[in-house]
Amino acid sequence: MNKAILRFILIALFPLLLNASHSILKNDILKQEVSQRIETMGKELVAKTGFHAYVIATNEHFPVGFNLVEYTKKYEAKLDKPYVIFVFAPFAKITQKTQSTGRVGIIPSSKTFAKHYDYEGVRDAGLDVISVKDKNTIEDKHNIGVLQAFSELADNLASSKNVELESTLPNDTGNMVFVLKILIYFGSLLVLWIFILRPLIMRIKNGNK
């Protein structure tokens, strides 16, 4: 092959090779900046732990009860084990009656490997971002939610091997939700004390005089 032609082909393919995706199996939703950040976290996770985390971000309109585990099996042959796949399908139907949509799946290569992360913690890290009412567009919320959930997943996997990752994100939303829960709990106790317990104690004291 002519060297000039070969050089042209290599130059044309270089951007594709540079952006070759390891952690993202399917992407219908994520912006390039988010995809690159996920790739960075995924590569650091593999380098430090040998664990693999993958993302499927799809705009497919799955029907109610669609089996996400079966859906991911078509990727299984090319995946490195042990692995976890984070599936984000915002247009998947949840119930037929309400027509509500949006499903998340976190699918490990084995039940044993599932012990290396907190399913609910990873799920909530993404959903908490998406459900917050703010000025962000739904597209931006989807991107931030997937990024935050993947970061939480990577941190969970790394922590299970006593490793700390440098490329992951602080879960500010998770911390905010935790603080809000504490405030709500404290407020409930305060209301209970002011309107029920304190008057009851005062009546008992006055009755004993």
Question: Where do the model's predicted regions map?
Answer:
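Bacterial N-terminal signal peptides
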Residues: 8-16
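Absolute protein N-terminus
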Residues: 1, 20-21
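C-terminal single-pass membrane-anchor helix
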Residues: 166-209
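Intrinsic disorder/low-complexity segments enriched in polar/small residues
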Residues: 4, 125-129, 206
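Positively charged n-region of N-terminal signal peptides that target proteins for export
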Residues: 1-8
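Folded, non-transmembrane soluble domains that reside on the lumenal/extracytoplasmic side of membranes
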Residues: 21-174
